[in-house]
Swiss-Prot record:
Listed GO CC annotations: plasma membrane
Protein name: Protein SMALL AUXIN UP-REGULATED RNA 8
Taxonomy, superkingdom: Eukaryota
Alphabetically ordered keywords of this record: Cell membrane, Developmental protein, Growth regulation, Membrane
Amino acid sequence: MSILKKSTKLAQTAMLRQILKRCSSLGKKNGGGGYEEVDLPLDVPKGHFPVYVGHNRSRYIVPISFLTNLDFQCLLRRAEEEFGFDHDMGLTIPCDELFFQDLTSMIR
């Protein structure tokens, strides 16, 4: 494996870890700097996470398995560049809602 492929693979792995960590913690900081437990929304089944898409920030529940899809990873990189992952707005995907629906239906 070339060095370029290795470095790209490492960057993807780091990004996926950060997203999974963010999705799995879903807690809010308490005054002591730690996290307190917060119940997940009832409409988010185990193995899934919510994302917000488009200008209207429409909410979608997607399976964690999407994180391994290269096209979905591309959307996540765009989200990281535009919004970053360390904010309280939820994971926001900066793309047209129709495009997102088409992409996710192809992934499924």
